[in-house]
Amino acid sequence: MNSTAANVKPEPGLYGPDAAASPAIARYLIQGPSPLSIGLVVLIGAISSFLLQQFLKPAVNPLSPKFTSNTWPWLGSLGMMIGHWTFWKSCIKESKTGQFSFWLGRTHVVGLSGPDARKMFFEHPALDLHKATDLTPLGVNFWPIHAIFTPRDEKFQKSTYWLRTLTHLMKTPNMERCLPGVIQDARTGLEALKRDTPSGIINTPKVWPVVFKQTARVFMADDVTDDPKLWATTLGAIDTILHTFSPFNTLLPWIPEPSMIRRRMARRALLRVSRGIVRDRHASPKSASKNDAVQSLINLGDPDDNISEFMINAAFVGVVNAHVIFPQLLNALAVHLDWQDKVYKEVTEVADQHCKEQCLPLVDKLFHIPLSAWENSFPNAALMMEEISRIWTCFPTARFNTLYESIPIPGTSEVIPARTHAIYNSTEIHFNPKLYDRPASFRPDRFAPESQKTWDKEPHGLNTWGTGQRLCSGMRWAKLQQNILMAVALSLYRLEKCDKDGKPDPSAYEKQQAMDGDLDEEVAFVLPECFVKLIPRE
């Protein structure tokens, strides 16, 4: 034995019977652990339990469709968030039934495909749209779901404040009230394009503020559209919500991710605007005579909180598709000059029919067109809008099974489990060659009255304006808006397709015949650049 080691003695008071001689240990033995150390242990334990809960997947119904292999650890199916159509096709390819399961974070989702499952998805009354908004990156800004989306009676899903108010604002007197203002909004915004861009070369997705100003006038208040300060705040907030995205908003919503923080702040800014307007209206005796959307709801005696929430939700929902459709209509009109000429001819004929002062510029004549003519006198514009909507409304749509029991998936032995999300991708129908001849081609005449409705070969073969249990409640305004925007644009300009330098784009027509080249967004929630040259009309 090493003699040096053998001669080493333990330090008194630290080991053995002399341990109590250490003052620190003695205090610990007598007093117990400090509150700080207990707190740290509890905090670490709580964080560990929370993380464990977040990363462990809950049990699922064994009759659920088989899970896809396209899955990342912890995150789930990231492909669904960054390339939805590529992901969808790969999942269907490896599924024996065409149905599949996948994870978004800890959320179990059932993916559906095929005519029978599609019919069930769109028609089953227990599959709720609003309760599935936590699943979509655009919907999480408005979570938890406000009471305006809750039915007064579970048996009548359409008995919500949201739908009742939309129906009220879609009535003819309200549409007629808004008509002069929204025509002027379109004129002011589109005339400014040439003033702000002397070359006349515009990137069409950048014109969306014109679309939003009209939407704000219809669903919010004249204060928003007419007050520069309120307009700037509201426009900036909507811009953030529309164009700020991260897949983690849905996959790991508990992480304070920067884009989520910006979106939450934007939503709060919208609430401050809407609540401030409602508060000011109550404070001013003269407000009762105002004639806009918010005042009509106040005059009906609606609760202030409901009005404020409706304003910001309607402003967002009203622009989310419209700000995509109009830029693509401008592009299509610039590429297909034959269709541009058809729509322009409609505009001039309708304007001349309703305006007695023939010496006025065409854009001034538009103010004389009555609501009924705006809605019914532009058949070629309607065909273009339907075709653009078919092409550009290709995305996953979510529902939530509100039942505490499973819903069988027709034609399979599989189910959508109780309290579980389901998703259907409308790209499956809108680019289906069985339903549409040459679906990747821009062909508005496929929707002409004399054409065969090939999409009726299968249930719900067209989903441009909703279908089944969920039709677009704001469809009347949406169609009217696009007619007005096209008419004002063509009354001011002739449109020519070009590149970013203003040179003619020789491949533009070919691109319009192969619009299925990439059905996944290049950048999520950001439209690809699309340049058009504005040539002022004489």
Swiss-Prot record:
Entry keyword annotation includes Nucleotidyltransferase: no
Membrane topology type: Single-pass membrane protein
Annotated TM spans: 36-56
One cellular component (GO) term of this entry: membrane
UniProt keyword Metal-binding, yes or no: yes
Alphabetical list of InterPro entries matching this protein: Cyt_P450 (IPR001128), Cyt_P450_E_grp-I (IPR002401), Cyt_P450_sf (IPR036396)
Catalysed reaction equations from the record: 2 nataloe emodin + reduced [NADPH--hemoprotein reductase] + O2 = cladofulvin + oxidized [NADPH--hemoprotein reductase] + 2 H2O + H(+)
Induction field: Expression is positively regulated by the transcriptional regulator wor1. Expression is down-regulated during biotrophic growth within tomato leaves. The expression is induced at later stages of infection when conidiophores emerge from the plant and produce conidia.
UniProt binding sites for heme: 472
Protein keywords: Glycoprotein, Heme, Iron, Membrane, Metal-binding, Monooxygenase, Oxidoreductase, Transmembrane, Transmembrane helix
EC number: 1.14.13.-
GO molecular function: heme binding; iron ion binding; monooxygenase activity; oxidoreductase activity, acting on paired donors, with incorporation or reduction of molecular oxygen
Residues of this chain annotated as glycosylated in UniProt: 306, 425
Cofactor: heme
Record-linked CDD domains: cytochrome_P450
SUPFAM superfamilies noted in UniProt: Cytochrome P450 (SSF48264)
Job of this protein: Cytochrome P450 monooxygenase; part of the gene cluster that mediates the biosynthesis of the bianthraquinone cladofulvin, a conidial pigment not required for virulence but that plays a role in fitness and resistance to environmental stresses including UV light and low-temperature stress. The pathway begins with the synthesis of atrochrysone thioester by the polyketide synthase (PKS) claG. The atrochrysone carboxyl ACP thioesterase claF then breaks the thioester bond and releases the atrochrysone carboxylic acid from claG.
Family membership noted in the UniProt record: Belongs to the cytochrome P450 family.
Name of this chain's protein: Cytochrome P450 monooxygenase claM
Source organism of this protein record: Passalora fulva (Tomato leaf mold)
